[in-house]
């Protein structure tokens, strides 16, 4: 299945780098839960990577809906963006939203600033 075919599908993700954990080689802190889809193969020969957004605590496993594919132009290691299946989310590029964390709830909706997502890649 092509990575774009995951959009709109319910996906099971195994988290191997929890929210707040430190990257094993580069030393940065993960602002989101990060994992992979077991038993899949991506362009880099490993499992397909996923960012889990909208979950505010470290987790081990997650099932949610794929809303986007982040295509990296310098390699074949695309990332899927997975969210809780029962929530509404909006990607915004606005300086008017200055969250304490990369994710903020406003009027019952989740806003994920594009800058926060880009910084985590």
Language-model-detected regions and their locations in the chain:
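Hydrophobic N-terminal alpha-helices or hydrophobic patches in metabolic proteins across all domains
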Residues: 1-121
């Amino acid at each position: 299945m092509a990575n774009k075919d995951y959009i709109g599908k319910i996906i099971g993700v195994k988290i191997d780098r929890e929210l707040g954990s430190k990257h094993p080689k580069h030393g940065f802190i993960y602002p989101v839960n990060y994992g992979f889809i077991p038993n899949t193969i991506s362009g880099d020969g490993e499992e397909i990577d996923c960012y889990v957004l909208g979950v505010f605590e470290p987790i081990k496993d997650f099932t949610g809906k794929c809303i986007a594919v982040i295509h990296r132009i310098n390699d074949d290691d695309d990332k899927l963006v997975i969210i809780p299946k029962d929530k509404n989310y909006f990607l915004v590029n606005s300086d008017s939203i200055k969250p304490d964390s990369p994710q903020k709830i406003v009027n019952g909706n989740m806003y994920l600033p594009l800058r926060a997502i880009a910084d985590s890649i």
